[in-house]
């Protein structure tokens, strides 16, 4: 196991002083004993801060909503899982037998969670400077490729990317009413998001427009956007 972890450390570009932290970061909740969920929680907070700080300095003219959307792109599960696959993190995960048999070492959510846990472990091992250095090294190429133009997406796409970055279910849209004559209808849509206790609402001349309005309202309710971006 020790030699195996040596290889992973070389891929990560970081050598742990406390190897137990590394092992814990690679331990899924399906495995007996302690698991990486607390480290994942810590790593998620550190990742969001470091990327937010980097974007703040990298895009001095970008608005708050733009910065939030750019950050969501960088910290979403898909991006983290891609990193994990590049480092072959799945080969080093400790999984319960059921999760192992079902291919958990390939699952996007498990890989993304492990990357966040590793960030948390690095922070506890040698501090914030080390965690920041590794995050920027890992995500630097994606960061340099971003432009504020990348935020010019419709509200439904922005909401979906934000929720995916938090590991949440996708929003659900429901047409609750249609008013007016066939040639001049108004659609009323509810948007249900797991992170919100109340549904948001939108209306417009088509179902698509109504869904976009409801999604925009959800982004404001979540505090991701202020309604003026």
Swiss-Prot record:
Residues 5-127 form the RNase III domain. This is Ribonuclease 3. It is found in: Cytoplasm. The keyword rRNA-binding applies. GO terms for biological process: mRNA processing; regulation of gene expression; RNA processing; rRNA processing; tRNA processing. It comes from the Bacteria. It is an enzyme of class 3 (hydrolase). The keyword rRNA processing applies. The active site is at 44, 116. One of its GO terms (cellular component) is cytosol. Keywords: Cytoplasm, Endonuclease, Hydrolase, Magnesium, Metal-binding, mRNA processing, Nuclease, RNA-binding, rRNA processing, rRNA-binding, tRNA processing. Mg(2+) binds at residues 40, 113, 116. Its EC number is 3.1.26.3. The gene is rnc. It holds the Pfam family Ribonucleas_3_3. Belongs to the ribonuclease III family. Its cofactor is Mg(2+). PANTHER family: RIBONUCLEASE 3 (PTHR11207:SF0), RIBONUCLEASE III (PTHR11207). It catalyses: Endonucleolytic cleavage to 5'-phosphomonoester. GO terms for molecular function: double-stranded RNA binding; metal ion binding; ribonuclease III activity; rRNA binding. Homodimer. Residues 154-224 form the DRBM domain.
